[in-house]
Amino acid sequence: MPKRETQSLHDTQQQPGPTAPQRDSLFAAPIAKLGDWTFDEKVAEVFPDMISRSVPGYSNIISMIGMLAERFVQPNSQIYDLGCSLGAATLSMRRNIKVEGCKIIAVDNSPAMIERCRRHIDAFRAETPVDVVESDILDIQLENASMVVLNFTLQFLEPADRQRLLNQVYQGLRPGGALVLSEKFNFEDNDVGELLFNMHHDFKRANGYSELEISQKRSMLENVMLTDSVETHKKRLHQAGFEHAEVWFQCFNFGSLIALKAGEAQ
């Protein structure tokens, strides 16, 4: 029987489904030939542990996405979680939606992530329905949206596709709607960038990752995860049409922006 959604948001991050997450040891031993990063079955299996030990402030962002949903989700609207992975942001939003007639659409292009996401969503009962969709987020037609989440997703798109996606998000939002855009940042000030890069590595070491694990994962990600500066993100958001865009959370070189579409909520 599905559980009622009564556990805390922090617990949802540690246990996003009916079983506890496995510890990430994917890169603990030397890998002879490192390919590019993919969100495959092995990554999906350890993803909750991996992201909590790798992304500073991740659990805070997830919790606060729920708080933002309570504030911004409008009655009879749709909410999109684009690049939903295992559904942590979806669960956080669903728990905090207080208005009627809403639906969350959670999208990811990884079959392994989608399969587990469906299990995690189905493990908890709630009033707000969720559609879990396996698709390229660029192919999703956004409509009647009051809130959209891109939680560490945009950085995995080809740079040439990023503006197009943000344009689609803006067009699909209702007046008064919000986009939450969480990303790893790079910095125009090289000294600050180096400091925060090193602090992030200290964070991973403190969470039990070895130098080998850190190095191998970085090598696999370097051609796949292409980061932007906060200034670049803001420029894109304003170009898409968002009247307001600002960082609302940051820890080291990771953070989240909120972008607002002007107008009165309907």
Swiss-Prot record:
S-adenosyl-L-methionine binds at Y58, G83, C84, S85, D108, N109, D136, I137, N151, R218. Its EC number is 2.1.3.-. Residues 1-24 are annotated as: Disordered. Homodimer. Keywords: S-adenosyl-L-methionine, Transferase. The keyword Glycoprotein does not apply. GO terms for biological process: tRNA wobble uridine modification. It comes from Yersinia enterocolitica serotype O:8 / biotype 1B (strain NCTC 13174 / 8081). The keyword Amino-acid biosynthesis does not apply. This is Carboxy-S-adenosyl-L-methionine synthase. Transmembrane segments: none annotated. InterPro entries: CmoA, Methyltransf_25, SAM-dependent_MTases_sf. It catalyses: prephenate + S-adenosyl-L-methionine = carboxy-S-adenosyl-L-methionine + 3-phenylpyruvate + H2O. One of its GO terms (molecular function) is carboxyl- or carbamoyltransferase activity. The lineage of its organism: Bacteria, Pseudomonadati, Pseudomonadota, Gammaproteobacteria, Enterobacterales. It is an enzyme of class 2 (transferase). Belongs to the class I-like SAM-binding methyltransferase superfamily. Cx-SAM synthase family. Catalyzes the conversion of S-adenosyl-L-methionine (SAM) to carboxy-S-adenosyl-L-methionine (Cx-SAM).
